[in-house]
Amino acid sequence: MKLKTLSVGEVNNYVKKLVENDFILKNLNVKGEISNLKFHSSGHIYFSLKDENSKVNCIMFKNNAVNLDFRLEEGMKVEIKARLGVYHKEGTYQLYCENIKKAGIGELFEEFHKLKKELSEEGIFDEKYKRALPKFPKRIGIITAKTGAAVRDIINVIQRRNKSLDIILYPAKVQGENAADSIIEGIRYFNNEKSVDVIILGRGGGFIEELWAFNNRDLAYEIFNSRIPTVSAVGHEVDFTISDFVSDMRAPTPSAAGELVSPSLQEMINDLLNKKEFLHRAIDRKFLNAKRDVDLLYKGLKGNNPKDIIEKRIKEVNSLEEKLNFLGKRKIDKAKDELIALNSILQTLNPLNTLGRGYSVIMDKEDKVINNVSELKKNDMVKVIMKDGSVNIDIKIINE
């Protein structure tokens, strides 16, 4: 018997009917660990359920998701009630979840949180230790697998933004056994042998076990002790590793890390223009301040001009001289008037004026005025003072 040749669609439809009509596959209870968890804006929840060997894609529609009494998390162990369905267009199958209950936190997830808590308590995540990335680096070191999307994305972004930057790649294992040691060797290489301005630790997205190399205690301390600033760019935006918390900066993706560390040429030009403008403004301010100081100094000097001061003092001296002359003249005039009055009195009392009226004054040899005859003796020499002179006379006869 010859079988009919089927189209791809017919094959998918046939498998879909087999699966959907199977009693067991319509009433599954499956346990595993949640990974690749995504909450869609529509309200649907997409994730994978995995164990040590396998994984299966799952979806929980909004009408069932609203009934959950806890929030799903990466690494969480759960047990789901679901039916297996076939996506006809792609020929893939997935579990359609009706209900989810906790089955315990995944061991790796639990180990991650334990290490994160320990390192946080040891202080190596503290913001005070975070260093700023260089604004205009010249050489960029990258530690990642030598092939893959991560290294391509980082290099493409850096070269697109600024072709003048030097890029040095340290090819390292980023997954599996000894991966953490390989990354540690890369950090030491750049710190000891190559002078770079910043280091990117990069890896593409994956499950928690695929990113586990970046959840290593020794690697955390190597990053912490690096003298060169580090950027952690591991996985997708929803993925977090210990290296994210200890690095100086976390980038949500490798491409974003390339953006963070590489200033574009236009940014550099804009920065130079801004600095030029800043310098111009600073010089203008300095000039205006200096001009203001000079103006103030000029006004001060003008107010204290020696010539002006001398002229002012001359005016003051002239004024004082005039005042002294006035006061002196007034005092002299007053004294003159007083002298005239006194002279008039003296003239009135002057004996010589009396002589002018025919009187005379007799004085002895000691020029003492003789008022009485009894003061004379015979042969005394006396001086007779008259209006126009004096004569000496010997007393010969005294008549009393």
Swiss-Prot record:
Its EC number is 3.1.11.6. It is an enzyme of class 3 (hydrolase). Pfam families: Exonuc_VII_L, tRNA_anti_2. It is found in: Cytoplasm. InterPro entries: Exonuc_VII_L, Exonuc_VII_lsu_C, OB-fold_nuc-bd_dom. The keyword Cytoplasm applies. Its main location: cytoplasm. PANTHER family: EXODEOXYRIBONUCLEASE 7 LARGE SUBUNIT. This is Exodeoxyribonuclease 7 large subunit. It comes from Clostridium perfringens (strain SM101 / Type A). The gene is xseA.
